[in-house]
Amino acid sequence: MKFAVIVLPGSNCDIDMYHAIQDELGEQVEYVWHDETSLDGFDGVLVPGGFSYGDYLRCGAIARFSNIMPAVKKAAAEGKPVLGVCNGFQILQELGILPGAMRRNKDLKFICRPVELIVENNETQFTSGYQKGESISVPVAHGEGNFYCDEDTLAKLIENNQIAFTYGDDINGSVNRIAGITNEEGNVLGMMPHPERAVDSLLGSADGLKLFQSIVKNWRDTHVTTA
C-alpha cells in the first residue's frame, strides 16, 4: 500500500506521520508538497497536523485553497482512505468533506498531553483493529479542537454511526466529547488526537498503531488477491 503525506506551509506532524507508515508498518510513503495537483498512484492520503499557513483567518481556512486539495477531494470521492489529524481534520472540514467546525478549547488554553479515547465504532477501515468501547491513550496538541455542530448534524452523525472516537473526559468542550468522526461512506476519518505520536511504547503509548494497521489490513483485504 502506498500513502501520500500532504505537506503544507506550517505542517509540523508530517515527519511523524511518515515515520509511522515507513518505520512501523513498512509500507510505501511519500511526501506530497501542497503545490502538486495529483495524487494518482497513491492508495491512501494522510493530511497531518500543524499550523498550516499560520492558522490565519481560521484553522485550515487558507489551506483548503492549496493546489493539492482538489486531488484530496477526488481521492475521498473515489473511496480511498483519507485520514486528517488535528489541523488535517480542520482542513477536511473546511473542504466540506467532513461536517462540523472547530472552536477554541473551552478554557481557551492549548492542550498538549496524552488523553483517554473511547472507540465508539470499530466497524470502520480505520478502527477495525480495536474493540468497541476500548479505552486507548493517544496524545492531543491543539488550541482549537472544540468540535461543534448543530443538533441536526449531531443526530445524523449518531444515526449513521459516524462517531469513531470520543474523549474519556470533557477536555475541550467538544459536543458529546467527540474526538473523531468519519464521512457517511466511512472512508474518511478526521480526528484531533495524534495516533502517529502513539505508535511505539517508547513514546508512551502504542495505541495509535492499530489505526494504521487497520487501514492497511482493510486495503489488502479489498485489493490483494491471494492464491
From Swiss-Prot:
UniProt keyword annotation of Ligase present: yes
Keywords: ATP-binding, Cytoplasm, Glutamine amidotransferase, Hydrolase, Ligase, Nucleotide-binding, Purine biosynthesis
The EC number(s) this enzyme carries: 6.3.5.3, 3.5.1.2
Glutamine amidotransferase type-1 domain span: 3-225
Highest taxon of the lineage: Bacteria
Gene3D superfamilies in the record: 3.40.50.880
Any single Gene Ontology cellular-component annotation: cytoplasm
SMART domains referenced in this protein's UniProt entry, alphabetically: GATase_5 (SM01211)
Pfam families according to UniProt: GATase_5 (PF13507)
Name this protein carries in UniProt: Phosphoribosylformylglycinamidine synthase subunit PurQ
Annotated source species: Bacillus pumilus (strain SAFR-032)
